[in-house]
Regions:
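General helical structural elements
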Residues: 10-13, 48, 537
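Signature of exported/secreted
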Residues: 27-224, 391
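Bacterial N-terminal signal peptides that target proteins for export
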Residues: 2-15
Length: 590
């Protein structure tokens, strides 16, 4: 038996050597090799063609929100560094999600269960991968069908469509770099919409054919401390400033009016103010003729809504912000904001806007105890209007407009009253002044409840949780500057801020607005600007292990259009404000 055993071992060794020689990569476990807190950035070309049969005047949109951000972030990877933990949420992105998963270098069959947005049934994706070739290439094919069990459960829901399709493609993996260097392929989908009645309108069965062509090409592998990352951010800022200047020039050359100052429906003054704020925070000279024309226009407009008034006050305060204040407070050399000294004309305007803003509250509650805002004077409220009202009031207070301490205490009561509590824990936060000294120690502290906030009722979202953190931070800062405030109320507010950061740590993403799946594609850049503001107000550099600024910046770098925009001028202003990291200064309790 010994000669036979030796022969068998020799045969197995030779077979293994041959297999390795033919495809050495296929015998390895593939893993992503990315810098700490870093990521791989890609250039993505996505083409989508849609046909509707029979032709209808109304067909629901198939794709909900922006496609997948063309990047792989180190802190989004599973512990095995073979796949991303972010689930696929859009059929456009199925090819990329399969190609970025490195768990099957030897090829074979596997099944992915994809939870898409509520418009579709959950999908079953049956994948066939070819063996990884010596050059790193690997073929991909898949069939996509509705999960039959889920379809039976949800078959009476008229808002859910059925999707099926096929895709073909290939990826190339560079073992030396530890990254996927390219993805290319195509897919064809058929979407069936059931017939249903909405009001008096009967909507018949609808069918849609979709063809997708998707290409990814590796652009760069970057880390937060790389000079190349800083260079790219600087270029993105430059390009977005140029885009906003171009759009602002066009709009101011026409007849820019306030639409009568309707607080519920007229948002043009607020959009103008947001763009002026972004340009001023980006470092544009106050003496610039375009900026002067924009501010002159803003000063003459009739402004009534809470959003518009809040942002207009922020834009005005930006004219008088000391140029070195942000860096002084960021490094800890300065503890409290410097009082602003606006001109007499601007101070009068700020007082007028502040008076209007203080009147846009919910009239159904005692404003001395509970203060919350809506678009105008109203019997309702929402946390988005409330956040922007408080941003404006805090900026006005920095400019010398007197705000009663009752406004801040009653606002704190509101935010504490409408939290959405979760599990307890200690948020792991690294502060900017510690990181600047090379200290990456996470400050844990006492356990708190993770708390999020919603727009009104419902589940917590990332955009509204950052709003709650920012609002409470500004209210407590104002009370500390005034040397007012009940110590217990301040402590409760500080604990809620820490709870908000714990919620963000537990739900963190820059790919979508965290919270219920249906909210993911909504208000993404609004959320990013809110994330920047919440973290900068509290001088937070790292949320747990996540570098929120690097990840958010990468999301913006790979999605910025060739003309410098991220959509309309409001979206571009939000993107620019995130990249510049110039939130209002706050006096915290630390």
């Amino acid at each position: 038996m010994k000669p036979f055993a030796r022969s068998l071992r020799a045969w197995l060794a030779a077979s293994l050597a041959l297999a390795t020689m033919l495809s050495p990569l296929a015998a390895q476990e593939l893993r992503w090799q990315l810098p700490k807190n870093g990521g791989a950035l890609y250039k993505r070309t996505l083409q989508v063609e849609e046909d509707v049969e029979p032709k209808q005047t109304w067909v629901p949109g198939v794709w909900h929100g922006e496609p997948m951000v063309a990047a792989v972030l180190a802190d989004e990877l599973a512990p095995d560094r073979q796949r991303m933990l972010e689930p696929a949420s859009d059929p456009r992105d199925l090819l990329a999600c399969i190609a970025l998963d490195l768990r099957q270098p030897r090829g074979g069959k596997t099944r992915l269960e994809v939870e898409t947005f509520a418009r579709f049934f959950p999908l079953q994706v049956d994948v066939v991968l070819g063996e990884l070739a010596a050059d790193g290439s690997q073929s991909i094919s898949a069939t996509i069908e509705v999960d039959a069990k889920a379809a039976r459960v949800a078959s009476t829901n008229p808002n859910i469509a059925k999707l099926r399709g096929k895709l073909q493609g290939r990826r190339v993996f560079d073992a030396g770099k530890g990254v996927v260097t390219s993805i290319e392929g195509s897919a064809e989908f058929t979407v069936d919409y059931p017939a249903f009645t909405e009001g008096t309108e009967v909507r018949p069965v609808r069918k849609q054919q979709i063809r997708v062509r998707d290409t990814w090409q590796l652009d760069a592998v970057l880390g937060p401390d790389d000079a190349e990352f800083r260079t790219r951010v600087a270029k993105a800022i430059h390009d977005s400033v140029a885009a906003l200047q171009k759009e602002l020039t066009t709009r101011l050359d026409g007849k820019f009016d306030d639409g009568g100052g309707d607080p519920h429906h007229e948002h043009r003054p607020g959009e103008l103010a947001l763009v002026l704020l972004a340009l001023k925070r980006a470092g544009e000279d106050t003496r610039d003729p375009l900026l002067q024309k924009g501010y002159a226009t803003l000063r003459r407009l009739v402004i009534a809504g809470s959003y518009e008034l809040g942002v207009a006050i922020l834009a005005m305060e930006a004219l008088y912000t000391p140029p070195t204040e942000w860096e002084e407070m960021r490094t800890g050399r300065q503890k409290a904001p410097t009082p602003r000294t606006p001109s007499a004309e601007d101070l009068a305007i700020l007082r007028e806007w502040t008076k209007k803003l203080l009147g846009n509250i919910d009239t159904t509650v005692d404003a001395a105890y509970l203060r919350r805002w809506h678009y105008g004077p109203s019997t309702g409220w929402d946390n988005s209007c409330t956040q922007y009202a408080l941003l404006g009031l805090y900026a006005a207070s920095l400019c010398g407009v007197e705000i009663s301490p009752t406004v801040w205490t009653a606002s704190i009561n509101h935010w504490l009253k409408c939290t959405k509590p979760g599990a307890s824990g200690a948020p792991r936060l690294t502060y900017q002044h510690d990181l600047a000294k090379g200290n990456r120690t996470r400050a844990g502290g006492a356990k708190v409840l993770a708390v999020g906030w919603a727009y009104q009722d419902g589940e917590a979202t990332g955009s509204m949780t950052t709003a709650g953190i920012s609002a409470l931070t500004l209210c407590t800062s104002a009370l500390r500057i005034q040397k007012k405030g009940n110590p217990k109320l301040l402590a409760d507010a500080d604990a809620a801020v820490r709870g908000g950061f714990l919620w963000l740590e537990q739900n963190f993403s820059v790919r979508h607005n965290p919270g219920p799946r249906g909210e993911w594609p909504n208000w993404q850049l609004y959320y990013l600007y809110g994330l920047e503001r919440a973290c900068e107000l509290n001088q937070v550099a790292l949320l747990g292990d996540r570098d929120w600024y690097f990840e958010g910046a990468v999301r913006l770098l790979v999605s910025q259009r060739a003309d410098g925009n991220w959509g309309d001028w409001v979206a571009t202003a939000f993107g620019l404000l995130f990249l510049k990291k110039t939130a209002l200064p706050a006096m915290t309790g630390r």
